[in-house]
């Protein structure tokens, strides 16, 4: 049985990963379940650095099992890759999704659709002992000039998925997970963990 420890205080993220490994000899445990309540300061300049900072923090606390952590950013080409590592706090510390979206739309006001290319990227850092691996999932699209769709969260209502003809907020959770950056990164995590199970 492999033990997978998730560096998150978000119960939804932990549950998502637990569901992902249902039926496999993998025990998924969150920080909360281990009684680790501290907030991890994300001071990295990239989402890769932030994912590693969180995973290393937890690895140093638990010293066993496989530790995973993830970070996600939205990168808009016209804005030189912004909001990127600052996606969650684009409009300021503790900004709401609505405030972040409003700031993004304001910065892109008058910019034609073909110049509004963007991509979401999720990085999952996997640490086992001294071994560190980064897994990546990317989803390409464009930023609309208005909100569209009721589902999802964050930038989902403004992110129009190339090849699907809908925003992420117009997809069901199941549809979103099949194509999303996070879904792609989680599939790579699953491949990695299943390979580890074979080695055991």
Swiss-Prot record:
Domain of life according to the entry: Bacteria
Record's protein name: dITP/XTP pyrophosphatase
GO cellular component: cytosol
Signal peptide from the UniProt entry: none
Binding site for substrate: 8-13, 72, 153-156, 176, 181-182
Gene Ontology terms: biological process: nucleotide metabolic process; purine nucleoside triphosphate catabolic process
Subunit description: Homodimer.
EC number: 3.6.1.66
Reactions catalysed, as given in the entry: XTP + H2O = XMP + diphosphate + H(+); dITP + H2O = dIMP + diphosphate + H(+); ITP + H2O = IMP + diphosphate + H(+)
InterPro entries with a match to the protein in the record: dITP/XTP_pyrophosphatase (IPR020922), ITPase-like_fam (IPR029001), RdgB/HAM1 (IPR002637)
Reported cofactor(s): Mg(2+)
Cofactor note: Binds 1 Mg(2+) ion per subunit.
Role: Pyrophosphatase that catalyzes the hydrolysis of nucleoside triphosphates to their monophosphate derivatives, with a high preference for the non-canonical purine nucleotides XTP (xanthosine triphosphate), dITP (deoxyinosine triphosphate) and ITP. Seems to function as a house-cleaning enzyme that removes non-canonical purine nucleotides from the nucleotide pool, thus preventing their incorporation into DNA/RNA and avoiding chromosomal lesions.
Enzyme class: hydrolase
Annotated GO MF terms: dITP diphosphatase activity; ITP diphosphatase activity; metal ion binding; nucleotide binding; ribonucleoside triphosphate phosphatase activity; XTP diphosphatase activity
Similarity-based family: Belongs to the HAM1 NTPase family.
Protein residues bound to Mg(2+): 41, 71
Active-site residues from the entry: 71
Organism annotation: Caldanaerobacter subterraneus subsp. tengcongensis (strain DSM 15242 / JCM 11007 / NBRC 100824 / MB4) (Thermoanaerobacter tengcongensis)
Cell inner membrane in keyword set: no
PANTHER family (UniProt xref): INOSINE TRIPHOSPHATE PYROPHOSPHATASE, INOSINE TRIPHOSPHATE PYROPHOSPHATASE/HAM1 PROTEIN
Keywords, sorted A to Z: Hydrolase, Magnesium, Metal-binding, Nucleotide metabolism, Nucleotide-binding
A Pfam family that the UniProt record links to this protein: Ham1p_like
